[in-house]
Swiss-Prot record:
All residue ranges annotated as the Tyr recombinase domain in the record: 109-294
Name used for this protein in its record: Tyrosine recombinase XerC
Keyword Electron transport on entry: no
GO CC list: cytoplasm
Active site residues according to the UniProt entry: 149, 173, 246, 249, 272, 281 (o-(3'-phospho-dna)-tyrosine intermediate)
Function comment: Site-specific tyrosine recombinase, which acts by catalyzing the cutting and rejoining of the recombining DNA molecules. The XerC-XerD complex is essential to convert dimers of the bacterial chromosome into monomers to permit their segregation at cell division. It also contributes to the segregational stability of plasmids.
InterPro entries referenced in this protein's UniProt entry, alphabetically: CB (IPR044068), DNA_brk_join_enz (IPR011010), Integrase-like_cat_sf (IPR013762), Integrase_catalytic (IPR002104), Integrase_recombinase_N (IPR010998), Integrase_SAM-like_N (IPR004107), Recomb_XerC (IPR011931), Recomb_XerD (IPR011932)
Gene: xerC
Pfam families, alphabetized: Phage_int_SAM_1, Phage_integrase
Subcellular location: Cytoplasm
Keywords on record: Cell cycle, Cell division, Chromosome partition, Cytoplasm, DNA integration, DNA recombination, DNA-binding
A GO term, aspect molecular function: DNA binding
Amino acid sequence: MENVNFTLNLFIEYLQIEKNYSEYTIACYKHDIGEFFEFMEREQIKQLQQVSYSDVRLFLTELHQRKQSSRSIARKMSSLRSFYKFLLREKIVSENPFALASLPKKEQKIPHFLYPDELEQLFVVNDLNTAIGQRNQAMIELLYATGIRVSECCNIRLSHIDFSVCTILISGKGNKQRYVPFGTYAKEALERYIQDGRQQLASKAKTPTDVLFLNARGGALTPRGVRHILNDIVERAALSLKVSPHTFRHTFATHLLNEGADLRSVQELLGHAHLSSTQVYTHVTKDHLRYVYLHSHPRA
């Protein structure tokens, strides 16, 4: 399987350099393709060129037998389809057996989001007299104010922020750039952190950096670091909820749409290439439904 692993490394390079995908996305591709490589070993398939449509169907059957969700199976098949598309382009294989496979319909899950009172509990636990507390407050205020992805948050540089018009230049998926606005709360938290806490953290760095969010050693904060920080904040807020960076993104979109923002504008703010990606947020909270009903129905 040496040649197979070498080919995977070529594909990963392509995702990093040409597609500019995040570390998390690339890790998902590696996991999905690695799972298929294990299947190839079990079936004694030595070369990628030898994989047939029958093998793909057998792999699909295995995934279903292991009770994997439709969403998970669809992602794996999509990863492998992209992998073979790359192999075709590089003339490593002569056909894409995954192109013929129909993807299972994804389950449409309503994204988990936070209510205002739950958000408030997260915003009051950080000690604003410390550098770490100032950084954490600025980070969660910004995540909620902008709906940016965790990878985008970690890539923000000081030069990307324009306080005069309260906007940030964001580099999104595929290196696509967009400007996102932020409000008063985020502005105050960012200014406090940049003027005080960030300088304290930056003084510990071996090499200077203009990345906005720094870790305790003065280096750039990573997506994994952000997730760890959020887990700690949620624990201190005594919330019995699972909150990830993406929860803030879901919350941002849900709150905007519930307050009357149009779908196209939210699509632009989130940096979605397709409107269908944004439409998942068109659910509304039960409280909002109740409010609309009470204020609109003649006999409510």
